[in-house]
Amino acid sequence: MADYYNVGKVTSAHGIKGEVKVYPLTNVPERFYDLEYVWIFDDQQRPHKYDIEYVKIISKGVCVKLKGIDTRGDAEKLKGAFLKVDSQNALELEENEYFIKDLVGMKVYTEEGSFLGTLVEVLKTGANDVYVIKTEEREILIPAIKEVVKKVDVDNKVMVVHLLEGL
């Protein structure tokens, strides 16, 4: 099975012509302009290909018109769906950049070797991403900055962090 990468999540219908408002899950929302198609998985986890008719950058997201989604009702059915790209359309990563799908599920340890928890979510903020680490008792928010994240081992699903005072 091919690898697929989430590039956005449908948050709502936009207008009456079948457009969907998408929350980008990429740090380059303009990349939607370069996409010819996206994949959306159905309830049985089968991929369906949708050609992109056009894209508009809007406040708090991207407006996307998918071929075959022609009414507001069609668009509303996609609310909550992830727009995905296949591996041939994935962006090349820079050094120390990672796909969210590769980070989620990582076991997180302190520099001292203590198990902290599991990375369960990546929050996109203005300045830097924030990793949500689920411990036995609670969730901890860790800024995704080099002063905190000391090592990321994608192959072994392990992250090592230096906890700043107050975390």
From Swiss-Prot:
Residues 94-167 form the PRC barrel domain. It is found in: Cytoplasm. Transmembrane segments: none annotated. Its main location: cytoplasm. GO terms for molecular function: ribosome binding. One of its GO terms (biological process) is ribosomal small subunit biogenesis. InterPro entries: PRC_barrel-like_sf, PRC_RimM, RimM, RimM_N, RimM_N_sf, Transl_B-barrel_sf. Gene3D superfamilies: PRC-barrel domain, RimM. Keywords: Chaperone, Cytoplasm, Ribosome biogenesis, rRNA processing. GO terms for cellular component: cytoplasm; ribosome. NCBIfam families: 16S_RimM. Binds ribosomal protein uS19. The PRC barrel domain binds ribosomal protein uS19. PANTHER family: RIBOSOME MATURATION FACTOR RIMM. Belongs to the RimM family. An accessory protein needed during the final step in the assembly of 30S ribosomal subunit, possibly for assembly of the head region. Essential for efficient processing of 16S rRNA. May be needed both before and after RbfA during the maturation of 16S rRNA. It has affinity for free ribosomal 30S subunits but not for 70S ribosomes. This is Ribosome maturation factor RimM. The gene is rimM.
